[in-house]
């Protein structure tokens, strides 16, 4: 065990032989890097939650977890381990140089596709900052960072150096400016105001940063009032772009998300349960209608239409996200 925190979070060393996942491995059009496994923010809808069991099993098999710890992590509510048992790739920086030799210049590396690289663990271990410092010695790369945390602004200095010879974009993840929604569905994550202040610090430093609104939640955050407030806040924070896509709800995530949804939005419970009973995605008609709504707001607030996470970054994952099944919710 590496360390623990007052909220009950424990940190476990996570040895690894490779830290960069290639496009062939991920099925996406970029290389990915995740400094941690699991995420203390613990968003109820997070698609990475279901994979945490594999890290737990591996740690047990390698003797890094006792039988008692393994039983605790894989218990009846084993999904809690995702946000309270964080696996730390503490040897990542020693391996990164070797892995970088495999990445052709002009290709893209996205940091934080299956964890938040600026979750509270980063204040202790500073692995993400170390990655950026190493990447700042490169030239010709495209680097994307996805985070919900204002801690990213701590690294404005190294991000500025990185951007001198590389293409850098920071995607601040925020689904709404409504504190109630955030506390209901992202109870351990930073409040909207803190994220927006972090975004402003980045844009004030001259960095290319904006919002990623993912997921848009049918019947909760997809109405004009929610979206207009969010777009306006992004504009005030100097966002250079805003990208949005609807919810995808995989089977391994439903057991965590649906009870919370029922508690806070009982009127939507049956609709979601029916919609996601057999599939993780919603009808194309909903996705297309939502896209039109987003494009209208992009024009209204002066953002480039369809800008945000570039097509070459997330082509396949965007297609997945834009195909979610939530009938009876139809933005116009």
Predicted segments, located by residue:
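Amphipathic alpha-helical segments that form well-ordered structural scaffolds
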Residues: 95, 134, 201, 289, ...
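Auxiliary Fe-S-binding modules of radical SAM enzymes
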Residues: 1-15, 21-26, 219-332
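Surface-exposed amphipathic alpha-helices with a cationic face
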Residues: 160-164, 199-204, 295, 299
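Conserved strand-turn element in the central/C-terminal portion of the radical SAM core barrel
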Residues: 145, 177-181, 186-188, 201-223, ...
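Conserved Radical SAM active-site core
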Residues: 2-36, 40-171, 175-183, 192, ...
């Amino acid at each position: 065990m590496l360390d623990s925190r007052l909220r009950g979070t424990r940190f476990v060393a996570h040895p690894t032989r490779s830290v960069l996942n290639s496009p062939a491995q991920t099925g996406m059009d970029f290389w990915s890097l995740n400094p941690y496994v699991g995420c203390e923010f613990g968003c109820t809808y997070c698609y990475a939650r279901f994979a945490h069991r594999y890290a737990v099993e591996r740690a047990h098999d390698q003797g890094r977890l006792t039988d008692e710890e393994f039983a605790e992590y894989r218990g009846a509510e084993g999904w809690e381990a995702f946000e309270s048992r964080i696996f730390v790739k503490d040897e990542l920086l020693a391996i990164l140089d070797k892995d970088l030799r495999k990445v052709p210049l002009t290709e893209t590396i996205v940091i934080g596709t299956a964890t938040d690289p600026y979750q509270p663990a980063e204040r202790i271990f500073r692995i993400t900052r170390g990655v950026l410092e190493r990447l700042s010695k490169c030239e010709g790369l495209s680097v994307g960072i996805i985070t919900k945390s204002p801690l990213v602004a701590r690294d404005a200095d190294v991000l500025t150096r990185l951007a001198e010879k590389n293409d850098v974009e920071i995607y601040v993840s925020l689904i709404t400016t409504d504190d109630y929604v955030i506390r209901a569905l992202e109870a351990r994550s930073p409040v909207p105001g803190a994220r927006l202040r972090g975004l402003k610090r980045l844009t004030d430093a001259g960095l290319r940063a904006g919002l990623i609104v993912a997921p848009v939640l049918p019947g909760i955050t997809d109405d004009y009032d929610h979206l207009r407030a969010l777009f306006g806040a992004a504009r005030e924070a100097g966002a250079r772009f805003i990208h949005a896509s609807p919810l995808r709800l995989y089977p391994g995530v439903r057991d965590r998300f649906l009870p919370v949804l029922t508690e806070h939005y009982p009127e939507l419970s049956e609709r979601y349960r029916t919609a996601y009973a057999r599939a993780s995605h919603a009808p194309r008609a909903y996705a297309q209608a939502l896209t039109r709504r987003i494009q209208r707001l992009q024009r209204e607030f002066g953002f480039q239409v369809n800008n945000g996470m570039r097509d070459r970054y997330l082509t396949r994952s965007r297609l997945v996200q834009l195909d979610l099944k939530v009938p009876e919710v139809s933005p116009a």
